Amino acid sequence: MAYGKIKSDLQELFTELKEQGLYKEERILTTPQGAKIGVQGGKEALNFCANNYLGLGNNPEVIKAAQDIMNYWGYGCNSVRFICGTQAIHKQLEEAMSKFLGMEDTILYAACFDANGGLFEPLLGEDSAVISDELNHASIIDGVRLCKAKRLRYKHSNMEELEIALKESKDCTYRLICTDGVFSMDGDMAKLDEICNLADKYDALVMVDDSHATGYIGKTGRGTPEYFGVTDRIDVITTTFGKALGGANGGCTSGRKEIIELLRQRSRPYLFSNTLAPSIVGATLKVLEMLSRSNELRDKVWENASYFRKEMVSAGFDIVPGNTAIVPIMLYEAPLAIKMADMLLEEGVYVIGFVYPVVPKGKARIRVQLSAAHSKEDLDFTIAAFKKIGRELGLI
């Protein structure tokens, strides 16, 4: 049998991954998302590795909004958008996201992975170029692979290399600079002001995946374009509803009106995927309403992140510099990252060791993510646990 060969090869691969400390085990939760969660086996732990930046994953207002919408609009749409899958609430959310992000128009997707996967191929042909930061999210990388445009990469946040790439692609019809707004593994922000200056100088478009920023970065949570004051200079923003904005799933692309209209006509993930579920649409609309009322949650996550980062640096941990809710503790060796995460779980702190291929080889880390749901007591407990395990492992 043909599968016999594949089976033995895969079993050998899994054995190698386990020996190298690269095999990923999924921990099973027994509670809803929150600052404190239950883990199968009866253990409770503080959760410091969720994308739950605003603490809205289990918020009663958000849950009720999802239930109310579902009671009227139903569980699913059973269709794609252009057949019979566009409800009034989908247009409401598109309009609300356009207003929130300061863009002309918005198109919804089942996930931001689909938003990125469906952007480049319809927009850029063989006579165009896409210029990408080397640490961009996998969804950008995969989306770029689907298009026929010339591909250029620049070293992470290196503006000199970006300018070289712009010069090299001067004869291309269109040039699109694409970058994460907040880089998910390092927690630093793209230099959007400098990127926009270069884009203006060389007549290029700018695209930002703001998934790890929308909702809490910027004065009112509008993301990295707001933080850098360049919203009107950004051509395309992709983002998710699966992180700060409630944490379920779904995403969108916002941007120039004509680009969004092209995506409605040609973007394959949009044309051939079911419409976003009504419950997610309703919950996301509620989140946007809540954010328009108050900056309290945004201010809280910033306060928590600043305090945690300061205390961990003071304790002697190797922290990647940054000023977002993502705080990477660098451990470099994959087995060490996995071991430390397991030891912290025994102390009541849920974190994950990130290893290759999620991060480059030799760059293993524990990525701590702060939330508005965390209390000062939660932070102090977790800092104390890190210090204890850090001393036991000889890290501090």
Residue ranges of model-derived segments:
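Active-site PLP attachment segment
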Residues: T220, E226-L262
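Conserved PLP-anchoring active-site segment centered on the Schiff-base-forming lysine
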Residues: L119-A138
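Active-site phosphate-binding strand-loop segment of PLP-dependent enzymes
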Residues: N52, L152-V208
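PLP-dependent aminotransferase class I/II
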Residues: L245-M312, F317-V320
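Short loop-beta-helix segment that forms the pyridoxal 5′-phosphate
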Residues: V80-T86, E94-G118
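PLP-dependent enzyme catalytic core of the Aspartate aminotransferase-like
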Residues: P60, K64-D68, Y72, E95, ...
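Conserved PLP-binding catalytic core of the aspartate aminotransferase-like
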Residues: D299-F308, V313-G348, V358, G362-K363, ...
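N-terminal "arm"/small-domain region of PLP-dependent enzymes with the aminotransferase-like
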Residues: Q11-W73, A204
